Structures are given as structure tokens and as C-alpha cells.
Amino acid sequence: MKTLHKPLQITVYQDVLCAWCYLADQRLDVLRQEFGEAIRWSVRPYPLRLHDALPTEREKRGLVEEVQRAQREQDPAARLLSTDLWLGGDPPRTSVPALAALEAARLQGPQARAFLARSMQRAALEQGINVSRTDVVFELASRVGLAMNEFSAAFRSEETRRLILDEHRDAANRGVRGVPTLVIGGRWMLCGLRELSEYREHILTCLGKVATPRSGSSERLVH
């Protein structure tokens, strides 16, 4: 009789406004296809802009520089990244509404959340659209085919907003300081964008397929 192994749990902390998360998503999509049911993926919100306030000029410069660094990556998606989100006249005040939209979409299934997430990433990071605005959220949710009455109720719920704040606090208590961050099998925490080969190597290690991976920066055991 064949032994059934429990899937490896991977938690991905991300912010839909983060260019690095967008690139990480593209790389992780390859591994989702590659490993199939051997891995159970959980995508959790970690807002980089937690509080509702316009970014200062200094903050905007830093955000633009991050996008410009991400543009230099070799991924095809990197060439599509734009700084318009932060240089335009309507920069996001906070990440919370956009992340709340994704949690509301999650109630309609993981695919619903994934479709809305990719739509929001493209709108924000390629087209420079402020996806934290309620009118934009509803437009994108409608375009990806969500059931809008259910989505609206969940999106407007204070409980959904509290969930985002609670997730941020719990992640910070676990040692998460930025995004993208992966926690693989409750064992390895990988902070920042990594090469596809490095993600794969850590996954194979936790699946018991290879020896302990080579050390990298911002990598540590989870306690």
C-alpha cells in the first residue's frame, strides 16, 4: 500500500503594491506547477504601508528606487514594471484596502483570490493605478468575475480590516520584517526575492530530496 505524505506547507507573506512580490509570484508560479500537490501554499497579507497616510517625498523616492532596482532583474515581468504608481498624482496611502480586497476574494476560493491579486498587481505595478481606492477595487473585482454582493460585504467588513492588522502583528512576532517572505515547512524563512533555483533547493531540502541548502542572506531557521 502506498504511503501518503502530508503536503509541505509554504506560507508566502506579500503586499500587492510590492514590485519584489510581483516578481517572486512569477517565479513561484513555476514551482506551483512543478511540485503540484506535494506543496500546500498559503498566501498571507503583510502590508508595507500599514497606516493611512500619504507617503512623504522621501518615502516616495525610496519606493521609486525599489521599483527601479526590481526593473533590473532578468525576469520578463521586470521590464513591465513602472514607477508611475508612486510618481503620479494619486499614490496609495495604505496597503490595507487592497489586501482586504484579496481576503474578501479568498472567501470565493483560492483561484478567485489569485485572479484578483494578479489583476491588482498588473494595474498597480505596470499601469500605475492606485488599487487601494474603493472604486478601483470594485472595478477589478467585477472584471475577474467575482460575485459582487458577497465580495462587497466581506470587503467592507471591519472584521476583514482587523484580520489584516492581526496578520501583520502575528507575522512580525514570527520575525517577518518585509516582503516577499517565505516560510517553508515551518523550518526556513527566506526574506526578499530569491532566484528560482534557491527556492527550489530549499523546498527539496524540506521534502527530504536533497541535503541542507547553501546559506544565503536573510535566511534563518524559524523558531
Model-derived regions: residue spans:
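Structural alpha/beta surface segment adjacent to cysteine/selenocysteine redox centers
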Residues: L23-G128, R133
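C-terminal cap of thioredoxin/glutaredoxin-like
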Residues: T3, L8, V12-Y13, L17-E34, ...
